[in-house]
Structure formats: structure tokens, C-alpha cells
Curated annotation (Swiss-Prot):
Gene expressing this chain: AIMT1
Record family assignment: Belongs to the class I-like SAM-binding methyltransferase superfamily. Cation-independent O-methyltransferase family. COMT subfamily.
PROSITE patterns the UniProt entry points to: SAM_OMT_II
GO annotation terms (biological process): methylation; phenylpropanoid biosynthetic process
pH behavior: Optimum pH is 7.5-8.0.
Further remarks about this protein from its record: The phenylpropene trans-anethole imparts the characteristic sweet aroma of anise seeds and leaves.
The protein's role, per its UniProt record: Phenylpropene O-methyltransferase that catalyzes the conversion of trans-anol to trans-anethole and isoeugenol to isomethyleugenol. Phenylpropenes are the primary constituents of various essential plant oils. They are produced as antimicrobial and antianimal compounds, or as floral attractants of pollinators.
Tissue expression notes: Highly expressed in developing fruits. Expressed at low levels in roots, young leaves, buds and flowers.
Binding site for S-adenosyl-L-methionine: 201, 224, 244-245, 259
The protein, known as: Trans-anol O-methyltransferase 1
Inhibition and activation profile: Inhibited by zinc and copper.
GO molecular function: (iso)eugenol O-methyltransferase activity; protein dimerization activity
Higher taxonomy: Eukaryota, Viridiplantae, Streptophyta, Embryophyta, Tracheophyta
Active site: residue positions: 262
Assigned keywords, A-Z: Methyltransferase, Phenylpropanoid metabolism, S-adenosyl-L-methionine, Transferase
Length: 358
């Protein structure tokens, strides 16, 4: 064994215990603690655990102490803030009070803006968690972890059977997409001369709504499987269409694939792209919006997010993965597009355009 390094040991220990943080997060989200903090104290104020407990449906006298311990670990990771205040009751002169930060605001359930609470609920759903039990089996024997954990059903087949998981996925997309898309659309100007945009796999049209907000001249078609489309909200400038992208895609001047190809193998991605090729005019294009993997692992926050998402694809999808720019360009070539180009990247997303003509 290499020489002992205590700092390295403590870092390794923290990694082992890191699941305590997201475990606490999901508990507090389900208890609506972040919502209580927002409602009662806003972004600038603080609440004592006693005050939070008063807003929960509990008579447990230990609830404030338990909440304090849960909130304390989040404060140690700078997810929430903490300060010492005079206690409401009891013998201690000072005790801890907690407040929201720019990070923890994204765990408030009842807000119109971006929220990661549905995503955390999704990945902690028992039907998602059980994929971990099958990863090693998939590595050694082949196949896919989610399929093995669900009697052969793929993730997308399972969505048609479990409304709770399907709804969490749709909420996740609706609540998490706009933040990064709005940042990207400040740099990407590829829709300025386009009259009609088809968003393939658009769920509740979060991406298309962002595109139209930056390009109000655009007419939008939101295309997804029927069980998703039937719950999609009515939105100005957007027509919802149900169908199967492996069979056909609605015709449009530009077709958007936002976070779609990462769900599928290379072979299936090529099939999707071929259907898109058939649906665009000679002057049309396919706009791929995805997280872009680097060729070598990097340790900045965006690269870490992308690598972590790649593991989610390994867990849940039938062969999906995050790809590099060169891998996307190769998929376009295999699908018959004679010309393609990486356009730009901003925040988590990058854009690759595929053209029907050179």
C-alpha cells in the first residue's frame, strides 16, 4: 500500500459518506422544509428548527432536534446557511437557525422558476434506485441494468406503465431545462431565420417554449409519445403532436433533438436522425442540443455534471450515453447528412447542426 496520507483518507471517507447529503435533501424536500423556509423567511431570513417543526404535521418532540441535525449537514456543504441565535425556549443561550441560499432555492417545490426537486425525487424513486443492484450483472453478462431490474422492460417501456415515474420525468424536464436553455439561446442564433421548428421528444415543450421566447416569429410543433402529449399544457404558438420518432417525424424547417440522442445507442440514434433527415426540406437542418463530453476527464463543475449524467444514462437507458463532438458528427454522417458542424456551447449544453445539403 502507498504511504498513508491523512487528508486523502479523510477525502475518501467523505466520499463513502456522501450519500448522506442527498439522502437528507430528499427527506427535506418531501417534508416541504425548503418551501417552509421560503414562505416564512424568504431568501434573506433564518428559521430555527423549532419554527420549522411548528409548520409540519407532527407532534414528535424530537422533530426539532432531528431537523437541526439534517439541516446542519447541508450547512456544512454550503447548501444552506446557518447562524447562531437566541433559542425560543430551553436552557441554551444560543442555538442554530438556518436560511436558504442561491443553491437551496432550487429545492423549493412550489415555485414557477427552475427547480431540481422533481429530478432528485426521480433518481431516488425506488424503481430507479433498484437499477444499481444490477449494474455489476450488466457489466459481467451484458444487457442493461434497468431492464434487468424490471423483468426485461426498458426505461421507456416502463414509463408507459408507471405514471408516477413518467410524471416525475416530465416535471424534471419542465423544471430543469429552461435555465441552461436560456443561457444557451443567448449565444446560439440558429433559429433567427427559421419559421417552423419541430421539437422531437419535447415532453411538455419546455425547450420549445424557450426557443419561441427568444424567437417569437417561430411556429412550434412539440412531438412526443402519446401518453406524454395527452398531459402537455396548451401553450401559445405550439402545436402538440403524438407519435413514434422511430416511425416518422413531423415535417419542419428545423428539427430539434434536445437531450434525446443521449437516451439511445449509436444504432438507434442513427435511425432517429434518418427520420429527421426525411422530415426536413433541402435547406433544412437538424439541431442537436446535448451535454458534450470532453475527450479527457476534466474536474470543472460542468464536466463533473456531464460525467455524472453519463452514469445516469448507464443506469437507466438501453445503451444511452453522453457523447463528444466528434461522436455526434459521426452519427450525422452515418445518418446520411453530408455536412455538419459544432456551433457553440454555453453552460451545460452544446449545439451541433446537421445539414441536408452541403
Amino acid at each position: 500500500m502507498a504511504s498513508h496520507d491523512q487528508e486523502a483518507f479523510l477525502t475518501a471517507m467523505q466520499i463513502v459518506n456522501s450519500s448522506a447529503v442527498d439522502g437528507v435533501l430528499i427527506c427535506l424536500i418531501e417534508l416541504n422544509v425548503f418551501d417552509i423556509m421560503m414562505q416564512k423567511a424568504g431568501m434573506d431570513g433564518y428559521l430555527h428548527p423549532d419554527e420549522i417543526a411548528l409548520n409540519l404535521p407532527t407532534k414528535n418532540p424530537q422533530a426539532p432536534e432531528m431537523l437541526d441535525r439534517m439541516l446542519r449537514i447541508l450547512a456544512s456543504h454550503s447548501i444552506i446557511k446557518c447562524k447562531l441565535v437566541k433559542k425560543m425556549s430551553g436552557n441554551a443561550l444560543l442555538t442554530r437557525a438556518y436560511g436558504l441560499t442561491l443553491i437551496s432555492q432550487y429545492f423549493v417545490n412550489a415555485q414557477d422558476g427552475p427547480c431540481l426537486a422533481p429530478y432528485l425525487k426521480l433518481i431516488h424513486h425506488k424503481q430507479m434506485q433498484n437499477s444499481w443492484e444490477k449494474v455489476n450483472e450488466a457489466v459481467l453478462e451484458g444487457g442493461y441494468a434497468f431492464n434487468k431490474a424490471h423483468a426485461g422492460s426498458t426505461f421507456f417501456e416502463y414509463l408507459g406503465k408507471d405514471k408516477s415515474v413518467a410524471e416525475l420525468l416530465s416535471q424534471t424536464m419542465a423544471k430543469s431545462i429552461p435555465t441552461s436553455m436560456n443561457i444557451l439561446l443567448k449565444s446560439y442564433k440558429g433559429f433567427e431565420g427559421v419559421k417552423e421548428v419541430v421539437d422531437v421528444g419535447g415532453a411538455y415543450a419546455a425547450t420549445l417554449s424557450c426557443i419561441i421566447s427568444f424567437n417569437p416569429h417561430v411556429k412550434g410543433i412539440n412531438f412526443d409519445v402519446p401518453h406524454v402529449i395527452k398531459n402537455a399544457p396548451s401553450l401559445p404558438g405550439i402545436t402538440h403532436v403524438g407519435g413514434d420518432m422511430f416511425e416518422s417525424v413531423p415535417r419542419g424547417e428545423a428539427i430539434v433533438l434536445q437531450r434525446v440522442l443521449h437516451d439511445w445507442t449509436d444504432e438507434e440514434s442513427v435511425k432517429i436522425l434518418k427520420k429527421c433527415y426525411e422530415a426536413i426540406p433541402d435547406h433544412g437542418k437538424v439541431v442537436i442540443i446535448e451535454m458534450i463530453q470532453t475527450e479527457m476527464p476534466e474536474d470543472d463543475i460542468i464536466a463533473k455534471n456531464i460525467s455524472e449524467m453519463d452514469i445516469r444514462m448507464l443506469l437507466y437507458t438501453p445503451g444511452g450515453k453522453e457523447r463528444t463532438v466528434n461522436e455526434f458528427l459521426m452519427l450525422g454522417k452515418q445518418a446520411g447528412f453530408p455536412s455538419s458542424k459544432y456551433i457553440c456551447g454555453a453552460d451545460l449544453y452544446g449545439v451541433v447542426e446537421l445539414y441536408k445539403k452541403k
